Every structure is written in structure tokens, then in C-alpha cells.
Amino acid sequence: MGKVIGIDLGTTNSCVAVMDGKTPKVIENAEGMRTTPSIVAFSDDGERLVGQPAKRQAVTNPERTFFAVKRLIGRRYDDPMVEKDKKLVPYKIVKASNGDAWVEADANTYSPSQVSAFILQKMKETAEAHLGAKVDQAVITVPAYFNDAQRQATKDAGKIAGLEVLRIINEPTAAALAYGLDKAKAGVIAVYDLGGGTFDVSILEIGDGVFEVKSTNGDTFLGGEDFDMRLVSYLADEFQKEQGINLRNDKLALQRLKEAAEKAKIELSSTTQTEINLPFITADQTGPKHLTMKLTRAKFEALVDDLVQKTIEPCRKALKDAGLTAGEIGEVVLVGGMTRMPKVQEVVKQLFGKEPHKGVNPDEVVAIGAAIQAGVLQGDVKDVLLLDVTPLSLGIETLGGVFTRIIDRNTTIPTKKSQVFSTAEDNQNAVTIRVFQGEREMAADNKVLGQFDLMGIPPSPRGMPQIEVTFDIDANGIVNVSARDKATGKEQQIRIQASGGLSEADIDKMVKDAEINAAEDKKRREAVDAKNHADALVHSTEKALAEHGAKVEEPERRAIEDALSDLREALKGDDAEAIKTKTNTLAQASMKLGEAMYKQQAEADAAKDAAKDDVVDAEFTEVDDDKNTKKSA
């Protein structure tokens, strides 16, 4: 299995990370940057540009440069937010045949999922260049307030990009994973995530590997793009007052204004004044016109104050839903580039009554969390499990790779169900509980959700320990998975809430797949033990035949080779009975080979003993040849 990568598919920038051993690592792109602009463009000759190259040419090619397309993903054309977006961007937003909002360039239309897929492909290529291996699986993050259509559209983007999306997880939850993975101290945190296009706030309780989402709230159309556009509007208004020219009618000028606004916004986070200087922004009959303007931090904050204030109400709602006061929040984690703005930090401090935590990189923390979740799914990271309530069966992997259901699909929640399992080997002191979701008989054919270990089982014969595995789903959709050794009372459990998951299409596909393959699954299940035993016998017989075949009579040797060939052929299929029959035939035929091996060993031992008896002690004289050595010049 190749590496599973974690991708933060952002409105303004995207980021990719991967687990490097036990540590998540952000991967630099071909341009040497740790984040990639979420921009796709088509040049005059039809070449597709993604990331920094697309951003560099945006000013001269505004109508074919798509940015902030994440705001359109999963939205209908008649959505009020789409109507608002149409007035803000220089590229064309059109109505698709299915009623969705798509984008258009040179008479070609693209779905937002398709444009997002181009960005995901760039992330995929970045990871492959770093790892030196093919990558085809990923965990992708989405805003916590994304609806089902938006989540599914994001998953579709992954598929178009050639990625199997193992999990869609919430951005604040991913950030909490990155923040809290190595924190020993339990507590309640708030994740305040103000990114390029969306705002989310989540309240989480963290402790002992448990990441429990208490509440979430947000706005999927509030972010850095709105701050940029507010400044663009101000610059256009000021220029019109001075020069009498409306720059909004000039798409090229508008794109230059947007770039300048973004740059000024970033600069004003670290300085109190900046200058915007755009020579030759436009021209009239009197000649070229230039835009030069000083902008103070105070003026910018006044322009966007209502946008910052819009983040307060979702925070209050999230606190109320969690049943907590601002004073009960132990730490406020800032996520998203916009949280670098001093005004935003000030509002957060006033609201929660404490300085926000600035120990994580707001541009990278979400991708890092996605990489951690990818590590969980791969088994590289343990004691962390993000679970959603699902209409598919929940169970664990047992001996032979079999999927043993504990809670069947369509079980009404809240529910709690336990099942007792045992060890597979003598003196086994630990068991790994691998949790799966699906309808197939073999665990590998289902979706792995995570794993954890139950340690400290007293040494005893296999099959003797009684390990009770319990799945507990409450009315809030929070899943508890625990394993308890009934003899010692030792227990290990994980509880996590996340709101990603499988779409209806995925569920339908898995159920239909299970129905179609039911008979085959049953045969494969029965064949597991038979195949394991047969494989071991084939290997040992081949080795013995190569070493001792000459000691066996020709007819017996031929019988062994025929039986070996028959069993190899049977192993190509999944007929358990045929494999068992051929295994028995080979076992009988190879008995003569075993006799020859024992006979040869006995003869070798006898020869060794005889040689020992024939050893004669001898005297020897040491000769020093140095005296006779001739020296030459």
C-alpha cells in the first residue's frame, strides 16, 4: 500500500502533507513553496496552468483565470451566493445542464469539481515528486459547515484527479488533530478558522487521544476573498472620484486591483501603513492614468469591520450548542491566513477573554491534520479515530482477514453492542483492534476506519483470553469503540466525532457490490485457512524436493511433483474443498520425501561422529622466515 496524503483544498491556497514516520510533514511544490495558489488558468494556446504560474498571468488573462472556485463547489446556479460571486469575479459563471453553477472559458465549460481536480492533481504530483512513488489515496479537508452536496462534489474532484478519497474531514477537526496530537493535557479548545473563502468555528474536547466535537458553526461565504473585494471596491470608488473613470468595467484593471488589494491586506498585518501604486491602470483621451494611494491599517479595519463582526455570532452559537461559556474554553487555536490580521486577533481575544494560541502555522495546520488522519487510516498513527455514524455495518478484522460485524447497517441509534473475541497465538500479550465499515465478508474489501491496541493481556494459551469489544453509538452520533480483557479488567477505548463520511452513492455502490460478490466472498472466506495451510506446504515441499529429491525413487518423486502441480493450480482459485483435497494428496505423497530427509540427516550425524574419532594430535615447529628475507633498494 502506497502513502496516503493529506490535502487542504483551500479557497485561496492549497497545501499537501504526509506522515514521515511518526511526524507529519508539509511538502514543498515544484516552485519551492509550502502552499500552492488555488488558481487554474488557460493560456491563449489552450495550455492549462495551475498554482503559481496561473497566478502570475492572472492580470493579463482575467477571463480565463479561475480563482476561489471552492465557493461554487456543490452549489446551484440560482443560489444567492452564486449570484453574489458573479458580481465579484472577472470570469464567467454559467448554468450547467443539471442546474449547477459552472465556469466558462473559450466556450468550454468546467464544473467546480473539475477545476478543483486540476488543483488536486498538482498536489498529487507534488507529493509524488517528494516521495518518489505513485500516490493514489488521500484524505481531503472541507469546511465544517459544508453540506452533503459540497462534500460529495469535493469527493468527485478527488476522483477526477485520480485519487481515492479515503476520508473527507472537517478543517477545524483536522486543525485540532494537528494541535492536540502531542498534547498530554486534556481540555476544551475552540478552533477559529477564517480562511480565504469560508469561516468555521468548532468547539472540541481533547484528552487521552479522544477528539470529541462538541459543536460547530460557520459561514461558507465569508473569508479573505471578501476582505480583498471590500478593498477593491474602495479603491475603485476612490479612483472614480478622482478621475471619473469606473474601473469595474475594465476586467484587466479589476484583476490588477485585486492583486494590489491582497498584497496591501497582507502588508497591513505587520505594518500600520502601506502604499498602493498601480501605474497605467487605465487611459482616456487625455492619456494614461495611474492609481497611487496610501492606506492605513485603521482605514482598512474600518472597511472590513462588519466582516470581522460577522464571525462573532457563529462563535456564540457554537458555545451555546456545546453548553459552554467562553471562560470554559482552555485555548483558542487560530487557523487560516486571515487570522494573521491584528483586528481578527483582537476580536477573538475580546470574545473568549484570552490571547489566542499562535503556535501553529495557520496556512499549514489543516493539511498536517489531514496527514495525521491519513496516518490513522494507514495504521501509522494509533489511538486516534475519527468516526461518523454510518448506515453501513461496523465491525472488526478477525483471524484470516475476515470482517466480523458488531453493529449491522440500518441499526437504530443510540445502540450498544458487544462481542467476545480471543487471541490467535499462545502467550499473546496484546491485540490490535482494526475497525472497519462495509458489507463485504473480507475486511480488506471494506473501509478501514482506524485501529488501537489493547495491551497487557496475561500470557495464556490461544483462545483462552476473553476480550470484549464494544461498539457504542449515542444519539449525538458519537461512537465509542472499546476493548476490555475480562480477566484483568484492562480497557482501551477511543471516542471521536467527525462529520465526513461516505456519500449515498458510495453506500449504494458498496451494498450492491456486496450483493453481487456475496457468493464469491463466502468462498474466499472459507478458503482463507485452507490457502494459508496449502501455501506453507507448497513452500516446504519445494524446498525439500530441491535439497533431497535425489534421495527419493523416481516414481515417488514424480508423484510428489504431480501433487505439487495440482495444488498450485488449485491455489489459483477459491474452491476451499478442492484446495483441502489437493493439500491432503500432497501431504501423503511427500511422506517419502520426509523419510529421505531424516535418513540423510542420520547418515550425516553418524559421519560426523566417525570423523571426530579419527582426529590425530600432531607436533609442529614454528619457523621465523624474517631472517631469510632479502631486502631490495
From Swiss-Prot:
Signal peptide: none annotated. The lineage of its organism: Bacteria, Pseudomonadati, Pseudomonadota, Alphaproteobacteria, Hyphomicrobiales. PROSITE patterns: HSP70_1 (PS00297), HSP70_2 (PS00329), HSP70_3 (PS01036). Coiled coil: none annotated. Belongs to the heat shock protein 70 family. Keywords: ATP-binding, Chaperone, Nucleotide-binding, Phosphoprotein, Stress response. Acts as a chaperone. Transmembrane segments: none annotated. GO terms for molecular function: ATP binding; ATP-dependent protein folding chaperone; unfolded protein binding. It comes from Rhodopseudomonas palustris (strain BisA53). It holds the Pfam family HSP70. The modification Phosphothreonine is found at residue 198. CDD domains: ASKHA_NBD_HSP70_HSPA9. Induction: By stress conditions e.g. heat shock. This is Chaperone protein DnaK.
